[in-house]
Structures are given as C-alpha cells and as structure tokens.
C-alpha cells in the first residue's frame, strides 16, 4: 500500500514503552480528537511493543495481553475507528520483538490475517533480532505480501533504522514507508 502523504499520528513507545493498556490507548485517541490534532491530519493511533502475551495461542496466533487489553484488539480498533481515527499496531521481522515478545518471523501470513481481522490500518514492523542468515529485503517483502493478501489495506512501516543499507533495497519490498535512522 502506498500513500500520497506521510501518515501522522501518535505512537505509544517513546512516552509509555511497555506501560500500555486499553484505557491509555483510548485516552490518547480521544486526546487526538479533542485537541484538534485529528482535524490537522494526525489520525493514526499506534500501539507499539509489549501488547501481546509472551507465548502465541494454541492456534499459532498472537494473543493480546488480557490484563492490558481485556476486550481484545478488535473492540479497541472499533472504538478508535468510531472516533474517525486509524488503528496501528507493532510487530517485528526478527526472532522476537525488541522487548522479547513473539515476532512475526515466518508467521507473516497468519499475523497479517489476524491484523486484518482486528481492523488494523497500520503496521510498524521492527528489525530487532534479525536472523543473520536472512536479508532484510526478504523479511519486509514477506510481510508486505502477506498484508497485501489479507483482505484489508494495511500500511507497512518498515522500522529498520537504516541498518543493512536499507535505502538500497527497501523500495523493492513494497513497504509504504521506512525509518532511515536509529532512535
């Protein structure tokens, strides 16, 4: 998916890191709306790392932490969409996420379908713990292909921090945008 202008919005990581939950995300979404930022184009609400349990479900799917997100991601997405905003989530192309939760490596199709079912509009896809025997280009292309076939338009944000000469290969992956530097 390609967009005409860069998406703008709010991401939970820099302010809250792993200290996130449904109430905080909804409070932040409402603040975008009530402050007028949404009217100025800031319409993405993105949950970063640490939203899942440390193990996948028996069906192989990612599972939201029920203590943090008791109603699940679909209900949260529906509420964010009702505010006229877009819902974003986080996953990782490496062996695990940066905070050591389950990643989407080799589970791209399952996770893309799950994200689509939950109503996700944006996926921040990180680069932590990348297997040494896999190329970044391959990892991002796999997720983009899975998202493109999920039945829902989901913008892929490749968060590779400019590692591995990202600028030389990222366009070929179909990613809608990419991060060019580290924190």
Residues of each region from the PLM?
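Extracellular/periplasmic catalytic domains that process cell-envelope and extracellular macromolecules
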Residues: 1-4, 37-40, 80-82, 116-117, ...
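N-terminal hydrophobic targeting/anchoring segments and the immediately downstream early-domain regions
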Residues: 1-13, 45
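Conserved structured core elements
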Residues: 4, 19-22, 26, 70, ...
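Second-shell loop/turn segments in exported
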Residues: 12-20, 64-66, 130
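Aromatic-lined carbohydrate-binding/catalytic grooves of carbohydrate-active enzymes
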Residues: 28-132
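Short low-complexity, flexible loop/linker segments enriched in glycine and/or proline
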Residues: 102-106, 138-141, 171-172
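Glycan-recognition surfaces
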Residues: 107-110, 152-183
């Amino acid at each position: 998916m390609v967009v005409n202008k860069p998406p703008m919005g709010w991401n939970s990581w820099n302010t809250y890191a792993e200290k996130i939950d449904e109430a905080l995300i909804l409070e932040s979404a409402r603040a975008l709306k009530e402050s007028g930022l949404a009217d100025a184009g800031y319409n993405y609400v993105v949950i970063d790392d640490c939203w899942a349990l440390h193990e996948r479900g028996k069906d192989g799917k990612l599972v939201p932490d029920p203590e943090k997100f008791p109603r699940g991601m679909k209900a949260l997405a529906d509420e964010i969409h009702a505010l006229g905003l877009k819902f974003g989530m986080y996953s990782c192309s490496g062996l695990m996420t940066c905070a050591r939760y389950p990643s989407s490596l080799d589970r791209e199709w399952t996770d893309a379908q799950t994200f689509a079912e939950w109503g996700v509009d944006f996926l921040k896809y990180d680069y932590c713990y990348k297997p040494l025997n896999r190329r970044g280009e391959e990892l991002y292309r796999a997720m983009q292909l899975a998202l493109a076939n999920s039945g829902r338009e989901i913008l892929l944000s490749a968060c590779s921090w400019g590692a591995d000469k990202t600028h030389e290969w990222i366009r070929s992956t179909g990613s809608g945008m990419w991060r060019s530097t580290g924190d």
